[in-house]
Amino acid sequence: AFAYAPKAPGRKNFLNEPETWDLLEQIRMYAEPYELTLLPEIHAAYEEHIYQTVAEKGYMTYDFFLPGLVIDAIENKRSKYLAAWAKELVEKKINTVNMLGCHDGIPMLDLKGILPEEDIQKLIALIVDRGGMVKNLHGQKNVYYQVNATYFSALGESEQKLLLARAIQIFMPGKPQVWYLDLFAGKNDHEAVKEAGEGGHKEINRTNLTDIQIRQGLQTDVVQKQLELLRFRST
């Protein structure tokens, strides 16, 4: 979102240069005395290589490519694109914070250029077929941003696939971030979407867990094994 901050008449008003970087540098100067690290968030197609520019400017960047690449690798039983991305992260020394699911949807726009267009469309269709929701932008089939679904449901609600996905995330370059609902193998919440009404598609992945649900979830094998992975990662 930071890329939309500086605006001026006649400019594209997305990542205006050098104003965008000047603004971030000002914020960094305020943050550093408090030992705070900036983590700029930006969604853009891989082919634009904006993630690389962010890294070259000395900032960490969100790895919005990983969620889709992991599903592609697991569902298509191939590591080609995922391995290429891991190699790039290491070779270019790009510092990331990665994730599988998050409070929003599973990023799709970001995959343009790192996955073939046909495979992105297949990925969208697969997740939608499993109960996910995609916002149709401008009425065009090939204009997309993200698919809203829990990561567990996107993987066909397979505990084995979720554990494999979490293990891949844990061992990928970067700092892992875990969305609480995915830790508890949360399923698509269509009732919450219905209650939210128009524009409430994001509620599919924002279920509020009760104290009892959390306590019961902590006893399940899928949660315990993820916690074991996270403890291993932190050692």
Model-identified regions with their sequence ranges:
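Active-site and adjacent substrate-binding regions of carbohydrate-active enzymes
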Residues: 1-235
